[in-house]
Amino acid sequence: MKVIFIAKKGAKRYSIKNSSLLGNCLFTINRLTYFAHLGNPQKVLNRNNTFTKEISEFIGMTSSSAFKELNHSLSQTIIGQHHLVERLLIALLADGHLLVEGAPGLAKTKAIKELSDRIEGNFQRIQFTPDLLPSDVTGTEIYRVEDGAFHFQKGPIFHNLILADEINRAPAKVQSALLEAMGERQVSVGKETFPLDKLFLVMATQNPIEQEGTYPLPEAQLDRFLMHVKIGYPNQESEHSILKLARAEQSQNDKVKETLEKISQQAIFEGREEINKLHMSPAVEEYIIHLTMATRQPAKYGDDLARWIDFGVSPRGTISLDRCARAYAWLQQKDFVSPDDVRAVLHDVYRHRILITFEAEAEGITTDQVINELIHRVPVA
């Protein structure tokens, strides 16, 4: 059922067309409750049927609920991997890239495909193999007889969402081509440079089980990723739900898939702006900096930390922690960033940026254990 109601902001009144699909927000006006669609600005009109800046701000105050609904929707199809789903949304909103490490069959591919079905954008999977060439990723120049000239044929990197499957199975040249595109947001071929879309997210995967014949990513390239997420097997209850979902999907295989309401790219960009403006107190900002400095000067926080940490976190890591903490807080529908939000994303942001010593490895100390010690020892300013 569609309802049109009047929303007030200051002395102005706006007519808002209701849509009871993804991204609904509850409003109570004159003791009556209505829903306003938040994911797609085209659903919001004023009396002249035009989208206005004022109504954008009105809707923007609660637009995080659209992404909360998106999180819930994805969790219904990606069962037992809530952490992965949440980190995927954080990477989307923080405008970064994700490195996911997990055994085969844990819904890594399914997660980003389901996300692509729910946002306005296109998706491409790149299977990394030892014989892959850089041009297979970025594209190549093709000679056309019609005009006797070379024309650039864009590769799969020119999509909004990219799955770089088993990135450590391709040679360093191919990895560098992808990581350069991730860092510079452009591809250079010959004398020409081609910009990538504003909405650009790469989710790269690694298989921790089979390491033979792989090309491990060096630390300098790992630093390009916003987060390094490790995922494990679902629990017994989730396994039951996965079986039920798989049977339901199999029985509906021949049926026409329901068209999902998509969140527009504009809504994503507006969400990013809100996240950048989220309030962060000087104490929380100092806490982020102290966490980074503790990885560079670990002796201040204990001789054992100094013995375990070889290289600390770069300034890019500090920036990444700030962006991820803001995005995490925003997804919780908070209007400020707390130390708990920083700690919630700390492992995924620092995991691939702290290099531990051989002595730590000999003692069986992992990077995650080092990060746990940082959380316990670094006080909030």
What kind of region is each of these model predictions?
Residues R118-R144:
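AAA+/P-loop NTPase substrate/partner-engagement loops
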Residues R144-I162:
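Conserved alpha-helical scaffold flanking the Walker A/P-loop in AAA+ ATPase domains
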